[in-house]
């Protein structure tokens, strides 16, 4: 699971140098004489967050490249306010064998949770069996392609753990909501890891907003 910055809004207004400054600039649309006031921008952003004036955070945009599994990608794609481009198994061959994933016990008190208490012997068994299955799956997939079977047909035998790449684009308001939701309890562990990788990039690009959100 990883995330990488692809693009972030670059203002062309003189005196407005970052996407974060642009959000503050847009927030002052009704006060044009004071729009370019970067000294008080962080305080304004904090005020807007405290009072839930979220619309200003729709004036800047960020795109990240996410490396994850098809299983987690299905959860990511449910965030419909975003715009996505995903690696197509229909048009491109899958070259990478999935890595084994951690085993966790089902939490019977909370079905959204899993418990990291699986014994080491069972973890080893689980990893070994996954490696066997993934090797068989990739062998069958590649054999199908060699026989001329279309990628769109051969892909159906690939497991949900198959790696994929997604470009995820959204407003800063979208990213705040996504990160808040997917780093919280009730999210699958692997998705939390991915959302935290996104959060690290967000903090670097939008330090004042991140501070106002108590992320740092």
Curated annotation (Swiss-Prot):
State whether keyword Phosphoprotein applies: no
Gene3D superfamilies in the cross-refs: 1.20.5.3070, 3.30.1360.170
* Positions that bind dUMP: 75-78, 86-90, 155, 182
Question: Under which EC number(s) is this enzyme classified?
Answer: 2.1.1.148
- What InterPro entries does the record point to? Thymidylate_synthase_ThyX, Thymidylate_synthase_ThyX_sf
A Gene Ontology molecular function term of the record: thymidylate synthase activity
What protein am I looking at?
Answer: Probable flavin-dependent thymidylate synthase
């Amino acid at each position: 699971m990883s995330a990488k910055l692809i693009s972030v809004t670059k203002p062309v207004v003189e005196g407005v140098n970052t996407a974060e400054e642009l959000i503050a600039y847009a927030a002052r649309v009704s006060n044009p004489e004071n729009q370019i006031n970067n000294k008080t921008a962080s305080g304004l952003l904090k005020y807007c967050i405290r009072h839930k004036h979220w619309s200003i955070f729709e004036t800047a945009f960020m795109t990240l490249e996410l490396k994850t599994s098809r299983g987690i990608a299905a959860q990511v794609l449910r965030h419909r306010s975003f715009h996505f481009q995903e690696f197509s198994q229909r048009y491109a061959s899958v070259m990478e064998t999935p890595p084994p994933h951690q085993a966790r016990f089902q939490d019977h008190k909370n079905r959204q949770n899993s418990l990291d208490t699986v014994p080491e012997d069972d973890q080893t068994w689980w990893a070994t069996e996954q490696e066997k299955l993934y090797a068989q799956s990739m062998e069958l997939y590649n054999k199908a392609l060699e026989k001329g079977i279309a990628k769109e047909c051969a892909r159906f035998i690939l497991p949900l753990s198959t790696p994929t790449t997604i470009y995820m684009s959204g407003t800063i308001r979208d990213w705040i909501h996504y990160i808040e939701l997917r780093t919280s309890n009730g999210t699958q562990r692997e998705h939390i890891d991915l959302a935290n990788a996104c959060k690290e990039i967000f903090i670097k690009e939008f330090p004042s907003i991140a501070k106002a959100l108590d992320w740092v």
